[in-house]
C-alpha cells in the first residue's frame, strides 16, 4: 500500500475536510496526529517574493512574462525557471504561483505584462519551459488563471462569454500544452465567471475538461479569496486559499456531502491530490519549514542578463544602431536613471538590486564617453520613495531604523526591528511575526540628507494613521480618516548635504487587511524640465529616450484607459529628436503603446520590464556587444480602436462578450487586412538572414503521419546573430472558419556570418486540427494545407503545399464519406433513408451530396444530432 493510500485509510472525515483550505495566507494545513506536513506557496511570476510588502526578503527579479515571451527561447526560459527554483528554496517555499498564461486579448489589459503572448501556442511552449525549469529542481509551479481571465475590469465578477470552439482553441490551449508537456503541480482558478459559472467551481472547465478529458492529476487551488458560494466543494476545486476556510469549511463540505453532488470518493480524490504535492516536494519526514532568505548569486545574475538581452526587440533601425564612435550620450526620460522593471500588483518583488538604463549605459561607456541624464518629464501619480543614499541611521547605515510595537502607543520593547532602505511598507493578513495584527504601531526614523538645496516636496501615504516629523516638527499630519489611502505632501526648504532628523510614526487599529505607510520625495525641479532635457540632447552625439509606463499605470487590479504613453512623453520625444537627429527611443513598457512619433525617429528598441539586469542588457544591445534577437509576442496596433476586442471591451451588465471569436491578435489583423504598427513576430537584427532550401518530407499525409519541415537560414551580414524562424499553417479548403494562418512551430537559431544553419520542425495532427463544437472533439478536415515559414507573421519567406488525406477506416462505409457516395450504394442508402430520409428530401441535395455525413451533422445538428450520427456510423460499419 502506498503512503498516500495508507494516510487516506487512517484519516477521519474531519481531517480530510481540514486539508481543503489553507492554514493561513501561504501554507496548507498540517496534521500532527498523522505527521502530515504542510507546503508553502509564494507569489510569482517575476520572482519568488516571499512575504508581502515591506517585510519581503530580497529576491531575484526576472524579466516579466511578456519579455520572456519575446525571447521565443524555451531554453533560456527553462534556465530562468531553474533560478526561480533556487529562490523558492531560499524562501522556504515549495510552489511558485506562476506562470501566468492568460491571452493578450486587448492591449490595455492590466496584467498583459505578466502574460506571455496573444498566441496560445507560443504561450504554451514558453510556459512549458518555465514550469520544467522549476520542477526539474524539485519545486512546483502553479499555472494560472484558469480560464478566460483576460482583463482586470470587474475581474471578481465579470462573466467571460466565449463560445466553446474559441475557448478550446485560444484560451484553454496554453494550459493544455503546458499541462501535457510539463505537468505543473497546481492550477489556479480565475476570479471571473466563464459563461455564467464562476471559474473556481466551473464544472465544465474544471471537471469535464481539466480533470476529465485532460486527465490532470495535480491540485486545483483558488485565487486568493476567489471563492464565492456553496458550489465550491463539488465544483472541481481542491484547495481554497487563503485560510481560514469559508466555502471549504467543515460545515459547508459536510452539507455538500449530505445534499450532493459531492461524494466521499470525490473528497478522497481531492485529498489524494494534496497529499501528492507533499510527496512530490519530499516533505514527509522533513523538519519544519525553512525561514525566508535570499541570496544574490553570480550565476543567477548571468542568467538574468542573458534572458533580459534575448527579450529586447529591435523594432526599427535606420543604421543608428549599434552605437559607434560616439563621445557623448544623453539618457533622457522619467525612468532613465531609475530602473522601472515591474508592473504593479501581486507579481512585484523586492529585487536584490536593479540596474537603470543610465547606470548600465554609463558603466559600459567607460571614461572616454560622457554620459549624462535628465528626466524631461515625470509620469508618477504619487511621489516616489527617496533615493536610498539620502537616508541614513544614527550609526551611518543606509536606510531608516524600523521598529514595530504591539498596541498603538509605541510603548514597551519593539516586537520587530530592522534597518531598511524600503520606506514603503505594507502588510497583508499575518505577514509580521509576533505582532498583533489588530493593534500595532510602527516607527521609522533616521536622517534625510538631500543632495541639493532648494524647495523639496516630502510626501506621506498611508492606509492607517500617521505623522511625519522633520527636525522634530510635524510636517505632514496623516491622521484623518478622510485621508485614508491618499498621499499628502508638504514643501520644505532644505540645504543640500545637511542631514535632517526624520521620523514617521504610524499605527493601525482594526481588523487585519491591507495596511501600508510610505514616504515620498521630489527634489527641487527646474522651471523647464523638458527644456533642460532638450538642451542636453542638443549638445550630445546621441540621445537615448527611455519612454515608460510603471506600476501606477500598468497593474493588476485595473486596465489602462488607452494605449498612450502617460504624461508629456510623446512631446518629449518629438522635441528631443528635433534637437538631435541621432535619437534612439527605448520603450520600457509591458504591453503595446501608440507611437505617433515613429516616422521621426531612426531607431526604436522594445525593452519591456526587463528584470534586475535591465540597464546592463540594454547597454549590451546599444553598443553592439550583443545582437538583438527578441521578437514581438503580441501585435502592436497603430491605435487602440484597431484591436479586435475594442467593440466588446469592457462589457456590460456583468458580461464581456468575446465577439471576435478565434480572431485574436494577428489572426484578426490578417483576416481583416488591417496594417498594424508592428506585426506579431516582428524583430530586427544587426545582421540579415536569407531563407532557402525549403523542404517538406511529404506532399501528402494522413492525420496519423508526422510531417518534417526543413529550411536553411544563412547569415548574409557581418556579425553573428540569432534568427527566430516561425512556422505557420494555413488551411486552404476548410468548411469551417479558420484564421489565415496559425503559429504551429518556431526555432531560434544562432548563425555566424556567412554560415548556414538548418531549422527543422516536426508537425503532428495538432498542427492541422480545429475544435468541432458540435462533436465536442478535435477534428481534422482532409484537403489542402499550406506550410509557411518566415521572420514574422507579415514576413513570410517560403511556403509549400501538402494534402491531408482522410484517415483510413477499416469499415467499408462510414460517416466520413460524402452523402453522394453513401446514396450510390443500396445498403448505405437504406441506412440513410431509415434515419434521415425526411431531412434528405428537404435538404439542398446539390450541396449535401458533396459533403461528408459528419459535415452535414455539424452544419445541421437539429436534424442530425451526434447521438444519431453515432447510431448511423454503427450501422454503416456492419455492412459487409
Cite the ranges covered by each PLM segment.
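Glycoside hydrolase catalytic-domain context in secreted enzymes
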Residues: 1-457, 461-769, 785-788, 793
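Mature N-terminal, pre-catalytic/accessory segment of carbohydrate-active enzymes
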Residues: 1-22, 804-816, 847-849, 872, ...
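Compact, charge-rich alpha-helical regulatory domains located at protein termini
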Residues: 808-876
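Terminal connector regions
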Residues: 764-807
Amino acid at each position: 500500500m502506498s503512503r498516500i493510500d495508507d494516510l487516506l485509510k487512517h484519516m477521519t472525515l474531519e481531517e480530510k475536510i481540514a486539508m481543503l483550505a489553507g492554514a493561513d495566507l501561504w501554507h496548507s494545513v498540517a496534521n500532527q496526529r498523522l505527521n502530515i506536513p504542510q507546503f508553502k506557496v509564494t507569489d510569482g511570476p517575476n520572482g519568488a517574493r516571499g512575504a508581502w510588502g515591506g517585510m519581503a526578503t530580497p529576491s531575484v527579479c526576472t524579466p516579466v512574462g511578456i519579455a520572456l515571451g519575446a525571447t521565443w527561447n524555451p531554453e533560456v526560459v527553462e534556465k530562468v525557471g531553474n533560478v526561480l527554483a533556487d529562490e523558492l528554496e531560499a524562501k522556504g517555499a515549495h510552489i511558485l504561483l506562476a506562470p501566468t498564461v492568460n491571452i493578450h486579448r486587448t492591449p490595455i489589459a492590466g496584467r498583459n505584462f505578466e502574460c506571455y503572448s496573444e498566441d496560445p501556442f507560443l504561450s504554451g511552449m514558453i510556459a512549458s519551459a518555465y514550469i520544467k525549469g522549476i520542477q526539474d529542481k524539485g519545486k512546483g509551479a502553479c499555472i494560472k488563471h484558469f480560464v478566460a481571465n483576460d482583463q482586470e475590469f470587474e475581474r471578481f465578477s465579470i462573466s467571460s462569454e466565449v463560445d466553446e470552439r474559441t475557448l478550446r482553441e485560444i484560451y484553454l490551449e496554453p494550459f493544455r500544452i503546458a499541462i501535457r508537456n510539463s505537468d505543473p503541480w497546481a492550477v489556479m482558478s480565475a476570479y471571473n465567471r466563464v459563461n455564467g459559472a464562476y471559474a473556481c467551481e466551473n464544472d465544465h472547465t474544471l471537471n469535464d475538461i481539466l480533470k476529465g478529458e485532460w486527465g490532470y492529476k495535480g491540485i486545483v487551488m483558488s485565487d486568493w479569496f476567489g471563492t464565492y458560494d456553496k458550489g465550491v466543494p463539488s465544483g472541481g476545486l481542491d484547495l481554497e486559499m487563503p485560510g481560514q476556510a469559508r466555502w471549504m469549511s467543515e460545515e459547508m463540505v459536510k452539507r455538500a456531502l449530505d445534499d450532493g453532488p459531492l461524494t466521499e470518493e470525490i473528497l478522497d480524490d481531492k485529498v489524494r491530490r494534496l497529499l501528492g504535492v507533499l510527496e512530490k516536494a519530499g516533505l514527509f519526514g522533513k523538519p519544519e519549514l525553512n525561514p525566508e532568505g535570499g541570496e544574490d548569486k553570480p550565476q543567477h545574475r548571468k542568467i538574468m542578463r542573458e534572458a533580459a538581452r534575448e527579450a529586447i526587440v529591435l523594432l526599427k533601425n535606420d543604421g543608428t544602431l549599434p552605437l559607434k564612435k560616439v563621445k557623448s550620450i544623453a539618457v533622457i526620460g522619467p525612468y532613465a536613471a531609475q530602473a522601472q522593471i515591474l508592473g504593479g500588483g501581486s507579481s512585484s518583488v523586492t529585487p536584490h538590486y536593479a540596474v537603470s538604463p543610465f547606470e548600465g549605459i554609463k558603466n559600459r561607456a567607460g571614461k572616454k564617453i560622457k554620459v549624462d541624464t535628465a528626466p524631461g518629464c515625470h509620469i508618477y501619480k504619487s511621489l516616489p520613495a527617496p533615493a536610498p543614499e539620502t537616508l541614513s541611521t544614527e550609526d551611518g547605515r543606509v536606510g531608516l531604523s524600523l521598529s514595530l510595537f504591539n498596541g498603538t502607543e509605541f510603548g514597551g520593547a519593539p516586537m520587530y526591528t530592522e534597518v531598511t532602505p524600503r520606506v514603503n511598507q505594507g502588510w497583508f493578513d499575518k505577514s509580521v511575526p509576533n505582532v498583533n495584527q489588530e493593534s500595532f504601531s510602527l516607527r521609522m526614523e533616521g536622517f534625510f540628507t538631500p543632495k541639493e538645496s532648494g524647495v523639496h516636496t516630502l510626501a506621506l501615504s498611508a492606509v492607517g494613521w500617521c505623522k511625519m516629523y522633520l527636525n522634530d516638527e510635524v510636517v505632514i499630519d496623516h491622521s484623518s480618516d478622510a485621508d485614508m489611502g491618499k498621499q499628502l505632501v508638504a514643501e520644505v526648504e532644505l540645504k543640500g548635504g545637511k542631514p535632517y532628523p526624520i521620523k514617521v510614526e504610524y499605527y493601525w487599529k482594526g481588523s487585519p487587511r491591507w495596511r501600508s505607510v510610505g514616504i515620498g520625495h521630489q527634489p527641487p525641479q527646474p522651471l523647464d524640465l523638458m527644456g533642460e532635457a532638450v538642451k542636453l540632447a542638443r549638445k550630445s552625439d546621441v540621445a537615448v529616450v527611455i519612454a515608460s509606463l510603471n506600476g501606477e499605470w500598468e497593474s493588476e487590479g485595473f486596465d489602462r484607459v488607452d494605449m498612450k504613453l502617460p504624461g508629456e512623453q510623446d512631446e518629449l520625444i518629438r522635441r528631443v529628436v528635433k534637437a538631435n537627429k541621432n535619437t534612439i527611443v527605448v520603450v520600457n513598457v509591458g504591453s503595446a503603446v501608440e507611437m505617433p512619433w515613429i516616422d521621426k525617429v531612426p531607431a526604436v528598441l522594445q525593452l519591456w520590464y526587463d528584470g534586475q539586469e535591465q540597464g546592463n542588457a540594454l547597454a549590451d544591445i546599444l553598443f553592439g556587444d550583443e545582437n538583438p534577437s527578441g521578437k514581438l509576442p503580441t501585435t502592436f496596433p497603430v491605435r487602440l480602436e484597431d484591436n479586435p476586442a475594442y467593440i466588446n471591451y469592457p462589457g456590460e451588465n456583468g458580461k464581456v462578450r468575446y465577439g471576435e471569436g478565434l480572431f485574436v491578435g494577428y489572426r484578426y489583423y490578417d483576416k481583416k487586412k488591417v496594417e498594424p504598427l508592428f506585426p506579431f513576430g516582428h524583430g530586427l537584427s544587426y545582421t540579415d538572414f536569407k531563407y532557402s532550401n525549403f523542404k517538406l518530407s511529404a506532399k501528402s499525409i494522413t492525420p496519423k503521419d508526422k510531417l518534417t519541415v526543413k529550411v536553411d537560414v544563412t547569415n548574409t551580414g557581418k556579425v553573428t546573430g540569432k534568427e527566430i524562424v516561425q512556422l505557420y499553417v494555413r488551411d486552404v479548403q476548410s468548411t469551417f472558419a479558420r484564421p489565415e494562418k496559425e503559429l504551429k512551430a518556431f526555432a531560434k537559431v544562432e548563425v555566424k556570418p556567412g554560415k548556414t544553419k538548418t531549422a527543422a520542425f516536426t508537425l503532428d495532427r495538432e498542427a492541422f486540427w480545429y475544435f468541432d463544437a458540435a462533436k465536442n472533439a478535435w477534428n481534422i478536415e482532409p484537403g489542402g494545407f499550406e506550410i509557411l515559414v518566415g521572420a514574422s507573421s507579415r514576413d513570410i519567406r517560403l511556403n509549400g503545399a501538402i494534402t491531408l488525406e482522410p484517415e483510413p477506416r477499416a469499415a467499408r462505409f462510414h460517416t466520413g464519406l460524402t452523402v453522394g457516395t453513401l446514396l450510390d450504394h443500396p445498403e448505405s442508402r437504406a441506412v440513410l433513408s431509415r434515419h434521415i430520409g425526411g431531412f434528405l428530401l428537404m435538404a439542398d441535395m446539390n450541396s449535401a451530396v458533396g459533403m461528408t455525413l459528419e459535415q452535414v451533422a455539424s452544419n445541421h445538428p437539429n436534424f442530425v444530432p451526434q447521438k444519431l450520427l453515432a447510431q448511423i456510423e454503427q450501422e454503416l460499419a456492419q455492412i459487409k
